[in-house]
Amino acid sequence: MSRPVPAVFGSVFHAQMPVIAYKDGKWQPTEWQTSADLTLAPGAHALHYGSECFEGLKAFRQADGKIVLFRPTANIARMQQSADILHLPRPETEAYLNALIELVKRAADEIPDAPAALYLRPTLIGTDPVIGK
């Protein structure tokens, strides 16, 4: 079955997104939310200090139909390094990887045939509503 490739890169988003909140000094369980606009407090750290980092990786459909992620552990390590540099909470490897894998499973029918791919953009943002924190 041939799967179409979206006409404009970055213009189509999956219906759901994983959200892993950091509260009371620890990461919370992954929640799946409808992909929608985000709401941030006017004092959100990301808005005043740019405390945000992101990564990018791809999921490819192989000739046999199997879907593979390209170097997810390297992606996670880069995100953790960026979090350390920005003094943001360091994402937990297992939860991050499980969220990526689950997202790819949920989006499997949307992954185009090679050489195209599903592009994932994990993002970490400082949402504390205190400018001086």
Locate predicted features.
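Conserved alpha/beta cores of soluble small-molecule-handling proteins
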Residues: 1-133
